[in-house]
From Swiss-Prot:
InterPro entries: DNA_gyrase_B_C, GyrB, HATPase_C_sf, Ribosomal_Su5_D2-typ_SF, Ribsml_uS5_D2-typ_fold_subgr, Topo_IIA, Topo_IIA-like_dom_sf, Topo_IIA_B. The gene is gyrB. This is DNA gyrase subunit B. Heterotetramer, composed of two GyrA and two GyrB chains. In the heterotetramer, GyrA contains the active site tyrosine that forms a transient covalent intermediate with DNA, while GyrB binds cofactors and catalyzes ATP hydrolysis. The keyword Ribonucleoprotein does not apply. The lineage of its organism: Bacteria, Bacillati, Bacillota, Bacilli, Bacillales. Few gyrases are as efficient as E.coli at forming negative supercoils. Not all organisms have 2 type II topoisomerases; in organisms with a single type II topoisomerase this enzyme also has to decatenate newly replicated chromosomes.
């Protein structure tokens, strides 16, 4: 068992004077969504990240190297670190111990004054007080000054004054809390995998820190994972490229600071065609990119072109590579730490600090240029790969023009098979990608033509994992999708131009249907990933069975549901079961009622919880290495629904 308290630690003047107070907690319980995004399962897990982020802040400041997260019985969460321990002396303005102020006053914390932490994570600094306000119970133990201090709270209200409960030779903080079921009405049960994925990501992003996750809810089956990466994001890139063929053995790695901005970049090219670029600012995944990404891309393109021309690999200036060309087959991670990050964009996941662009550009270009001149063989391979990508880009240009839709209102350029909806408001519009023309006919007849568009897809689309953009854009089904969506593709992609905010994959419930679904998801992940990140991609859930008893009809979506229904129904009158092999077997009314009607249907939203897992899965299922795919199928066949 790991204990995350520290034996010896420098407390470095981290005291009550550095805890600033901005405002009270009154609004948090009334409008929790404003502070944690939602009160769904996602918001529940966000509580854990707020506490863990405070421990990470201690680590970033150099005072902690062990963090432990435990899911206890009844879904209590315990987070322990071996930092300096939250200050316990009296905070001057409030006249209360600093630890109590941090846990009861909104935006009170070392991260706001500049004197406590140079850099802090904590998504926009919501803080421990919000977790306290939204918890049925919370308790804190502080190991500091050779003393253990303790205080407990209910719904954010202290139950007694901070008290001394023992002596200790360690330093650090332990926080235990149980989310309030009155607030989190959807669920208060934590998902181990969700916590595990983010904890692994945090361990990659903060090299040298050991983060342990343990699940003690089942005494007989305690689960534990511990993550510690001395290589940091360099190890992250190696893991992402695990199923690929790297062009150079070691990732190119830089870790430097300039103007109080810490820049860490790892990059490795592989023989594939897809670009995999992940960016972070203060441990927050910046899905929408930002100035750190801009600076990196600008430097990469400039340096590769300069090297290609000066080394005569590229013959003339007109052979210049575009940014997209230079990133083909690239896996890269950019992580910056900034004292005052400015987040913008639709989901507040785009870095806006203009000064970061120049710092990243300068630091990366100097390092990358040196790498190319010191490794001429690797440099030649990378430049030649870019030249091949440029040729494919030129070939793809005409095909790309064909897919371009001028605006959401531009009907003339729409594909012929598309039955569009009449509404021009993307927020309420949805498009169903339907397997086969016959099912397409039924869905066109059964839809709500005001908000629902139908695009039938004939046969299997191209496996984009094994193809360059020019070949991809020559695939008729892919071209029709790109045109219909209106967003463009790859480097031209613009989420703001999306014609539909729901893209629903609707395939048969058989092996072919699953394959088509995987091909479509691979395409979206590799070339239209922002659609997934924005939550626009869904999978329809057509029924598997129709059970008829007299005049009563029941539509059933899985075997478990069928068994339950059969056990509940009276044996008389006699009932019959029909299994649907395909969407085409249902008439328009049945499709509407079971699969398309927003009042009754079930849709699965496609989420990107774990970039590592997603990337490796697509590479394994759709890539060139047959052995990995065979192993995956053998390992997971037991979980599959087999229909003989």
């Amino acid at each position: 068992m790991v204990t995350a308290l520290s034996d010896v630690n420098n407390t470095d003047n981290y005291g009550a004077g550095q805890i600033q107070v901005l405002e009270g907690l009154e609004a948090v319980r009334k409008r929790p969504g404003m502070y944690i995004g939602s009160t769904s399962e996602r918001g529940l897990h966000h509580l854990v990240w707020e506490i863990v982020d405070n421990s990470i802040d201690e680590a970033l400041a150099g005072y902690a190297n062990q963090i432990e997260v435990v899911i206890e019985k009844d879904n209590w969460i315990k987070v322990t670190d071996n930092g300096r321990g939250i200050p316990v002396d009296i905070q001057e303005k409030m006249g209360r111990p600093a630890v109590e102020v941090i846990l009861t006053v909104l935006h009170a914390g070392g991260k706001f004054g500049g004197g406590g932490y140079k850099v802090s994570g904590g998504l926009h600094g919501v803080g421990s007080s919000v977790v306290n306000a939204l918890s049925q119970d919370l308790e804190v133990y502080v190991h500091r000054n050779e003393t253990i201090y303790h205080q407990a709270y209910k719904k954010g209200v202290p139950q007694f004054d901070l008290k001394e409960v023992g002596t200790t030779d360690k330093t650090g903080t332990v926080i235990r809390f149980k989310a309030d079921g009155e607030i989190f009405t959807e669920t208060t049960v934590y998902n181990y995998e969700t916590l595990q994925q983010r904890i692994r990501e945090l361990a990659f992003l903060n090299k040298g820190i050991q983060i342990t996750l343990r699940d003690e809810r089942d005494e007989e089956n305690v689960r534990e994972d511990s993550y510690h990466y001395e290589g940091g994001i360099k190890s992250y890139v190696e893991l992402l490229n695990e199923n690929k063929e790297p062009i150079h053995d070691e990732p190119i790695y830089i870790h430097q600071s300039k103007d109080d901005i810490e820049v860490e970049i790892a990059i490795q090219y592989n023989s594939g065609y897809a670009t995999n670029l992940l960016t972070y600012a203060n441990n927050i995944h910046t899905y929408e990119g930002g100035t750190h990404e801009d600076g990196f891309k600008r430097a990469l393109t400039r340096v590769l072109n300069s090297y290609g021309l000066s080394s005569k690999i590229m013959k003339e200036d007109k052979d210049r590579l575009s940014g997209e060309d230079t990133r083909e087959g690239m896996t890269a991670i950019i992580s910056i730490k900034h004292g005052d990050p400015q987040f913008e964009g639709q989901t507040k996941t785009k870095l806006g600090n203009s000064e970061v662009r120049q710092v990243v550009d300068k630091l990366f270009s100097e390092h990358f240029e040196r790498f190319l001149y010191e490794n001429p063989q690797v440099a030649r391979t990378v430049v030649e790969k870019g030249i091949m990508a440029a040729r494919a880009r030129v070939a793809a240009k005409k095909a790309r023009e064909v897919t371009r839709r001028k605006s959401a209102l531009d009907v003339a350029s729409l594909p012929g098979k598309l039955a569009d909806c009449s509404s021009k408001s993307p927020e309420e519009c949805e498009i169903f990608l339907v397997e086969g023309d016959s099912a397409g006919g039924s869905t066109k007849s059964g839809r709500d033509s005001r908000t629902q568009a139908i695009l039938p897809l004939r046969g299997k689309i191209l496996n984009v994992e094994k193809a360059r953009l020019d070949r991809i854009l020559n695939n008729n089904e892919i071209r029709q999708m790109i045109t219909a969506f209106g967003t463009g593709i790859g480097g031209d992609f613009d989420l703001a131009k999306a014609r539909y905010h729901k893209i629903v994959i609707m395939t048969d419930a058989d092996v072919d249907g699953a394959h088509i679904r995987t091909l479509l998801l691979t395409f979206f992940y590799r070339f239209m990933r922002p659609l997934i990140e924005a939550g626009y991609v869904y999978i329809a859930q057509p029924p598997l069975y129709k059970l008829t008893q007299g005049k009563q009809k029941y539509y059933v979506y899985n075997d478990r549901e069928l068994d339950k229904l059969k056990s509940e129904l009276n044996p008389t009158p006699k009932w019959s079961i029909a299994r649907y092999k395909g969407l085409g077997e249902m008439n328009a009314d049945q499709l509407w009622e079971t699969t398309m009607n927003p009042e009754h249907r079930a849709l699965l939203q496609v989420k990107l919880e774990d970039a590592i897992e997603a990337d490796q899965t697509f590479e394994m299922l759709m890539g060139d290495v047959v052995e990995n795919r065979r192993q995956f199928i053998e390992d997971n066949a037991v979980y599959a629904n087999l229909d003989f």
